[in-house]
Every structure is written in structure tokens, then in C-alpha cells.
């Protein structure tokens, strides 16, 4: 008799249904916290080092996009890992420190110039690949947040939509990337006061947009993003 279980799909190692979600679906419930099921499934198929990858910073008007890759130690996973947006700032900082001590962590960026030269999606993927390549151990399977495998990534991989809510490794990567980028924007805020980057991390808040109009565009602003582009274009028209 065939038993219940996750259904395998062809191509990259993966499942038609989240391997930890199928049981919840049978009882009409939804899993709300990430677990290690994707990682264990990959290991069961021969993977030895499974990395989770996520990026932070697609939406801001200023600053780089940052990515992190994390290989967790199955025997030493910090408690409280979740989507970085669901974890408070103090808890994120504590988890960041724990992960840096107990996991293989790599952090990378794609610059504002790269964002403007390519586009934010391509720049995000560039940062992801850099983070993967920066790991101390050679990951032989990658779990990627989202629905697209970055161009140039040759390691066997699996995309997971809302992966930071479903995979502990991706959740760890999301926390590392966010804490790293938030701290970077705090440093940049000291160099460029008035834009509120220490609190808005470069996102288009009312304070940030008003400061753009009053103080102008800095070298850290993304000129390809419409609010910044419009200010530059308006200034050019006024000078013509």
C-alpha cells in the first residue's frame, strides 16, 4: 500500500509540496514557522552541505542590495529563526551573533552602480552568487528564496517561494542579510545626515523622499529608481 508523503519532481531536488507542509495540509492547517525539512530532504538524496540563500534591499532608493548564504550545523541551530520581517530587531541582532559563531556564513553585496547598470533583480542575483561563492565550505546544494535560480549558478539548487518562512537555512540567511544591511545603512546615515537611513534603511519613506527634494541625490542613491531619476531629470530640465 502506498503511503502518504512528499511527491518528488524531476530536475532539481525538490517537492511538489513542501515536505513539512503535506501533513499540515491533510488536517487543513498551515505551517507558520520554518523548519529543516528541505535541508533533510536534500541530505537524504546525497547532499552534504546545504546552503540557504536570501537577499535584502530590493526596494530601497539608496544603498546596495545584500545577500547572505548560510550552511547550518544540524546539531546546533539557534532557536527563534524565522523570516527576518517577523523577528524583532533585538532578536535579529542576537541571532546574527549566534549564526556568525555556529554556522558557515557568507555575506555579499551588489553596489548601487551595479543596480543601475543591470537592474535590481539581476543585481540581487549577483549578490547571491557572490555570497554562495564566499562560503568556507563548498555547498553541494542550494536553497534559494524566490522563484528564480540566479544566472551562472551551477550548483544543484531549488527555489522556494517564501523560503524565509519555510526553510531554516533561508530564514537564517534573511536575518544575516538584513542585520548586515541595516548596520551598513546606519553607518551611511552618519555620513549623510537628514535622509533617515538609520531608521528607514534607504526605503522610500516620507522622511527620505522629502530629504531627497531638499538635500538632493547622493552617490548612494539608485539613479535608475523612479523617485531618484525624476529628481535628477527635473533638475536637468531646470538647468536647460
Go through the PLM ranges and name each one.
Residues 2, 8, 14-240:
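RNase H-like, Mg2+-dependent phosphodiesterase core
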Amino acid at each position: 500500500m502506498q503511503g502518504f508523503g512528499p511527491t518528488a519532481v524531476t530536475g532539481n531536488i525538490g517537492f511538489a509540496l513542501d515536505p513539512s507542509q503535506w501533513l499540515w495540509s491533510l488536517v487543513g492547517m498551515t505551517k507558520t514557522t520554518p523548519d529543516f525539512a528541505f535541508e533533510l530532504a536534500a541530505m537524504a538524496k546525497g547532499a552534504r552541505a546545504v546552503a540557504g540563500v536570501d537577499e535584502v534591499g530590493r526596494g530601497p532608493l539608496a544603498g546596495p542590495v545584500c545577500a547572505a548564504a548560510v550552511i547550518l550545523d544540524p546539531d546546533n541551530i539557534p532557536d527563534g529563526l524565522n523570516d527576518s520581517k517577523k523577528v524583532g530587531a533585538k532578536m535579529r541582532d542576537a541571532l546574527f551573533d549566534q549564526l556568525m559563531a555556529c554556522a558557515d556564513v557568507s555575506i555579499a553585496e551588489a553596489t548601487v552602480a551595479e543596480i543601475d547598470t543591470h537592474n535590481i533583480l539581476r543585481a540581487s542575483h549577483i549578490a547571491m552568487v557572490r555570497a554562495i561563492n564566499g562560503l568556507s565550505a563548498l555547498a553541494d546544494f542550494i536553497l534559494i528564496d524566490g522563484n528564480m535560480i540566479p544566472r551562472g549558478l551551477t550548483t544543484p539548487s531549488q527555489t522556494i517561494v517564501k523560503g524565509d518562512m519555510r526553510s531554516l537555512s533561508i530564514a537564517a540567511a534573511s536575518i544575516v542579510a538584513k542585520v548586515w544591511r541595516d548596520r551598513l545603512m546606519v553607518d551611511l546615515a552618519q555620513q549623510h545626515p537628514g535622509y533617515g537611513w538609520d531608521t528607514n534603511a534607504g526605503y522610500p519613506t516620507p522622511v527620505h523622499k522629502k530629504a531627497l527634494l531638499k538635500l538632493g541625490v547622493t552617490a548612494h542613491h539608485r539613479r535608475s529608481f523612479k523617485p531618484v531619476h525624476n529628481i535628477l531629470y527635473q533638475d536637468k530640465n531646470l538647468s536647460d
